[in-house]
Curated annotation (Swiss-Prot):
GO biological process: cell wall organization; peptidoglycan biosynthetic process; regulation of cell shape
Gene giving rise to this polypeptide: murI
Residues annotated as transmembrane: none
Species name: Shewanella frigidimarina (strain NCIMB 400)
GO molecular function: glutamate racemase activity
Binding annotation for substrate: D9, S10, Y41, G42, N74, T75, T184, H185
Signal peptide: none
Designated name of the protein: Glutamate racemase
Enzyme Commission number, as recorded: 5.1.1.3
Length: 259
């Protein structure tokens, strides 16, 4: 397996996961593929999400001769992993909300999950809660607006602090002591979230666990030229492109399923 690590998301949230993978595997080539034309995924029907994601990921994984696919999107991971594994022979890794470590960490046994509406309502999410947090009270907070705020933040745009406060106010009032960031966009604005919620709430995400899994599946480090390629399904603005350059990207492509 010699091709790049293909990291996929609806937008820039998957960069939070890719950053963790690069800490574990710094010498690999990476392609970051994001389907920003259909952002946010939490508002799509299940069939729209499945059809589009599977077609886009499988096509570009084959085109790139990817060594592994990381679906760095919680909403997509709840739906598309089995179909991807049927169509591709390379390893497929998804992200799972950090319910288990949150339940273990919580002293109050009162935790929260902040995710997209799609992730919050999935049977898969409830199964995780039943399996790993049966001894906890679990509060569910669904939002797509926070995805868009994270996109604006990374693109170096002014974010609507009133909207951010509106989203976080019910969480602050809930008396939880651990909050699971169940969307890969949310770690991008973890500092702002933590500032609002205060020191009494610990934030957890799945990035490090995913990175360890990828490292395990890729048995040896690559000796590549460490190229970072960004592919997107809708043109991006100069602010976001500048942010991606700061992340180390040097190759940019507007793509479709058939490119």
């Amino acid at each position: 397996m010699s091709g790049p690590i293909l990291v996929f998301d609806s937008g820039i949230g998957g960069l939070s996961v890719m950053n963790e993978i690069r800490k574990q595997l710094p010498l690999h080539d990476y392609c970051y593929l994001f389907d920003n034309a259909r952002l946010p995924y939490g508002n799509l029907s299940e069939q729209e999400l499945i059809t589009g994601c599977v077609a886009l990921i499988t096509h570009h994984a084959r085109r790139l001769n990817a060594s592994i696919v990381v679906v760095a999107c919680n909403t997509a991971s709840t739906l598309v992993l089995p179909l991807l594994r049927q169509q591709l022979t390379i390893p497929i890794v998804g992200v799972v909300p950090a319910i288990k470590p949150a339940a273990m960490l919580s002293k109050k046994k009162h935790i929260g999950l902040l995710a997209t509406p799609g992730t919050v309502k999935r049977d898969y999410t409830q199964a995780l809660i039943n399996q790993f947090a049966g001894n906890c009270k679990v509060e569910l907070f669904g939002t797509s607006d926070l995805v868009l705020l994270a996109e604006q933040y990374v693109a170096q745009q002014q974010i609507d602090m009133d909207k951010l406060n509106e989203i976080l106010a019910p969480i602050a009032a809930s008396n939880i002591d651990v909050l699971v960031l169940g969307c890969t966009h949310f770690p991008m604005i973890a500092t702002e979230i933590s500032h609002y919620l205060g020191e009494g709430v610990t934030l957890l995400d799945s990035g490090e666990a995913v990175a360890k899994r990828v490292r395990f599946l890729l048995s040896k480090e690559s000796n590549s030229n460490k190229q970072l390629q960004a592919c997107y399904t809708k043109d991006i603005g100069q602010g976001l492109k500048a942010a991606l350059v700061d992340y180390g990207f040097s190759d940019f492509s507007l793509v479709t399923i058939t490119d």
